[in-house]
C-alpha cells in the first residue's frame, strides 16, 4: 500500500468512526426536547397576547385549532369564520354574543397573525424531526423500536449513550435511566424511590 492509499483508508475509517447514526438520533432527540420547551414558551406568549383581542378562546383544547383562529378569524368580519375548519368554527362559536376583548387592528393584528404562522411552522418542523427520529430509531434498533416504540427506544439509547452500551447494561441500571435525579434524592434525602 502506498502513502496515498493509506491516508485515504485512514480518512475513511475516521469518517465512519467519528459520527455514527446514533449521533444523528441523539441530536434529533435533543432537538425535539428543546423545541418543545421553546414551543411551550412561545405558545403561552401568543395566548396571553391574543387574549387581549379574543379572551374567550384562551383555553382551546388543541394548539393547531387555536393557531388557525389567530391566523384567520377577525371578530369584526363574520365572513372570516366561514374560512375556518369545523373544529376552529366550533371554538369561535363558543363565544356568546360579542367578545369582551379589545379592538385590535392594522399592524397589531397583523403581527399576531404572523406570529401564529411562524409558530405553526415550528410545529411542522417538530413533526418532521419526530418522523426523522422514528426513521432513525427503526434503522438503528428495529427490535427495540418494535418492543418499545420509537420515542421510548430513542430515549433509552440516548440516556445510555449508545446502543452498544445499552446492550451491556444490567437490568437494574436500565431501570433507573433517566431517573438519576430521583434516585439521588432518594439516597440523600430519603424520599420515595423512583419506580
Regions flagged by a language model, labelled:
Residues 158-195:
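Phosphate-backbone recognition surface of nucleic-acid-processing proteins
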Residues 1-120, 142, 175-176, 183-187:
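Structure-specific DNA junction-binding interface
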Residues 122-140:
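Phosphate/ATP-binding catalytic cores across multiple sugar-kinase/actin-like superfamilies
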